[in-house]
Amino acid sequence: MLISLPKVRGIYRYDILMSKATWLNVGGRADILFKPRDIEDLTCLIKNTELPVSVIGATSNIIVRDSGIRGITVKLGKEFAYIKSKGNNSIVAGGAVLLSNLAHFAGNQQISGLEFLVGIPGTVGGGIEMNAGAYGSDIASVVQSIKAVNLEDGNLYEFSSEEMGYFYRGHSLKGNWIFVEAEFKGVNSEYELILQRLKEVIERKNKSQPIRGKTAGCIFKNPKNYRAWELIDKSGCLGLNIGGARISKKHCNFLLNYDNATASDLENLGNKVKDAVKDKFNVELEWEIRVLGSY
């Protein structure tokens, strides 16, 4: 069946194998991948299509199911990878900017407070969506304002950090959004001190996480009053595997694709861990990794 797509200035690509595009190297085919030229191009697409629209960023925290993704998958490209200083220790960044690049840019501007981002392998847009954080800091603590396009009506909105209603690994906005730009604010500091903190974050991550494996970051959010990895460990899940998927022995809140795992292997293993923790502690773990696609 032929589908009429809106006329855009960006790029449509078709039948994209997502296992070649995700950090976990799993997933079926996306029907249509769209990279908009700018915000206007993005809003034009959403307002003029009846197909379902999904959003991906760096694909560092997603499992795309083996069945793939139906409809249109939007990925912000280089046109949204800009960073600029506004003065007064403020930075404006597009939604496609890597969080690690934002941290280094801030350091070069002698702006402190964003160092924790250097160890998070995602984009500004994805980080805003999940209130990404590490080592006691999170996006909510440094973001000032956000521009977002609503996936239902296609309109552009701007929100303050307070209006986002941030909480641990999430926000309170209703509906589905794609975050296209954000303004961040830090504090002035000496470059050498910032550089040292950046190195400390990287070293801490390298020591505690399986950075050389095919992973998607932490599997589960930390439940209130608990650490997910401790619950997983005490539930006997360290090194557990299904097919080519394994729970990391270095950090048991990480899934590994260690031997040509399928998306089903990874998702089933995560759910097996959830069940084990529920049985042992009566605590319900919540996925931090996003799962895209239908069964």
From Swiss-Prot:
One of its GO terms (molecular function) is UDP-N-acetylmuramate dehydrogenase activity. Pathway: Cell wall biogenesis; peptidoglycan biosynthesis. It is found in: Cytoplasm. The active site is at 169, 218 (proton donor), 288. The keyword Oxidoreductase applies. Its EC number is 1.3.1.98. It catalyses: UDP-N-acetyl-alpha-D-muramate + NADP(+) = UDP-N-acetyl-3-O-(1-carboxyvinyl)-alpha-D-glucosamine + NADPH + H(+). The keyword NADP applies. Residues 26-189 form the FAD-binding PCMH-type domain. InterPro entries: FAD-bd_PCMH, FAD-bd_PCMH-like_sf, FAD-bd_PCMH_sub1, FAD-bd_PCMH_sub2, MurB, MurB_C, MurB_C_sf, Oxid_FAD_bind_N. One of its GO terms (cellular component) is cytosol. It holds the Pfam family MurB_C. Its cofactor is FAD. Gene3D superfamilies: 3.30.465.10, UDP-N-acetylenolpyruvoylglucosamine reductase, C-terminal domain, Uridine Diphospho-n-acetylenolpyruvylglucosamine Reductase, domain 2. One of its GO terms (biological process) is regulation of cell shape. It comes from the Bacteria. Keywords: Cell cycle, Cell division, Cell shape, Cell wall biogenesis/degradation, Cytoplasm, FAD, Flavoprotein, NADP, Oxidoreductase, Peptidoglycan synthesis. Its main location: cytoplasm. NCBIfam families: murB, PRK13905.1. Cell wall formation. PANTHER family: UDP-N-ACETYLENOLPYRUVOYLGLUCOSAMINE REDUCTASE. Belongs to the MurB family. This is UDP-N-acetylenolpyruvoylglucosamine reductase. It comes from Wolbachia sp. subsp. Drosophila simulans (strain wRi).
